[in-house]
Design a protein with these regions (language model features):
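Conserved catalytic-core motifs of GNAT/GCN5-like acyltransferases
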Residues: 130-138, 282-298
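Conserved acetyl-CoA-binding loop-helix of GNAT-fold acetyltransferases
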Residues: 92-102, 232, 238-254, 276-280
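Conserved beta-strand-loop-alpha-helix junction that forms the acyl-donor binding cleft
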Residues: 114-121, 263-275, 284, 291-293
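Catalytic core segments in nucleotide and nucleic-acid processing enzymes
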Residues: 228-231, 235, 248-253, 260, ...
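Conserved donor-binding loop and adjoining core beta-sheet/short helix segment
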Residues: 11-104, 209-230, 234, 289
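Short amphipathic alpha-helix that is part of the acyltransferase structural core
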Residues: 1-37, 140-185
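Acyl-donor-binding surface of acyltransferase catalytic domains
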Residues: 1, 5, 10, 35, ...
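A conserved beta-strand-loop-helix scaffold within acyl/acetyltransferase catalytic domains
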Residues: 171-234
Length: 299
């Protein structure tokens, strides 16, 4: 699997030796979930009536090729199960897709999900795009009107209000986005992010204009710093503040322990404004999660 996946993701903005290390650890972790009962215990056993062992990941051999697969639920919704392919040593053809779906038939999934390079994949339905940049070439930043300040517990109420106001405005002004596909972190998550010093308040000329949430961690097999939320207050929109703030944070993180890692985040396909912002901030689409409808195996 490692050799195939190295060739599949060869154009990612990291050295081959780094990519190899990331993929080796990823495959090791995913294979351990074939026997890890603490992993299978996370799934809705009572609601589905399926035994715990059913939710262990499975390495399937199809026509001499291997596919490492596992059960998932889109957005945690029990009514939206899918099969995730987390490792493979061959392209996915119709025969493999059909046999994988048959193996997981009790899950009643309608889709198999794969992670492919770039943004376009003709056979798939996009789930999320991964926009990222390497810390090896940080952007220039000379915008003295913009500053970032790490939020404290005293800022909690303001952050809650800012998130609420910004999301409500987005739902009202961007037709493709709504509370059904774009939601902010909840209060408990926000509190956790503040305690971990992951919330940055954006100041323009010393006035609070929005916030960024950025945490160190993994995204699939990628490692680095992940932007998990970003909002600009309605009164401050239209001046590329989000992109400018992301460039500033990018620059600041470059001087921390960011070596051999990525500055990244996921964006849903309906969120065109965030894609444009990410590109202005120096990130490009390097990977995308794509759904393949299982019914196509019977075409």
């Amino acid at each position: 699997m490692l050799s195939y996946m190295l060739s599949q993701y060869a154009r990612l903005p990291v050295p081959e030796v780094t990519l190899r290390s990331w993929l080796k650890q990823w495959l090791s972790e995913q294979e351990s979930r074939c026997t890890d009962r603490s992993f299978s215990a996370r799934f809705p056993l009572r609601e589905t009536g399926l035994c715990q062992e059913y939710f262990l990941q499975r390495k399937l051999k199809i026509d001499g090729k291997q596919f490492l697969t596992g059960p998932r639920y889109q957005g945690g919704n029990i009514n939206k199960p899918f099969i995730d392919i987390v490792g493979m040593d061959s392209d996915l053809n119709h025969t493999a897709l059909e046999l994988i779906s048959k193996e997981w038939s009790q899950l009643r999934a309608q889709y198999v999900r794969i992670l492919v390079p770039g943004q376009s994949f003709l056979q798939g339905i996009p789930d999320q795009y991964i926009y990222a940049a390497s810390f090896s070439e940080p952007p220039e930043f000379n915008d003295k009107s913009l500053t970032l300040q790490v939020a404290t517990y005293e800022d909690f109420d303001w952050c809650c209000q800012a998130l609420g106001d910004a999301y409500k405005h987005t739902w009202q002004t961007v037709r493709e986005l709504s509370a059904s596909n774009l939601v902010a972190v909840d209060n408990e998550e926000l509190c956790d992010h503040i305690s971990e010093r992951e919330v940055y308040i954006i100041y323009e000329n010393d006035v609070r204009a929005g916030l960024l949430i950025c945490q160190k961690g993994n995204l699939a097999f990628l490692r680095g710093y992940r932007i998990t939320d970003k909002v600009i207050l309605p009164a401050f929109r239209g001046r590329s503040l989000s992109a400018r703030a992301q460039r500033l944070l990018y620059r600041l993180l470059t001087h921390s322990d960011s070596e051999l890692s990525l500055y990244m985040g996921t964006i849903i396909p309906q969120n065109i404004p965030s894609m444009k912002t990410a590109e202005r901030a120096g990130r490009t689409c390097i990977l995308s999660y794509q759904f393949l409808p299982i019914c196509r195996t019977h075409d």
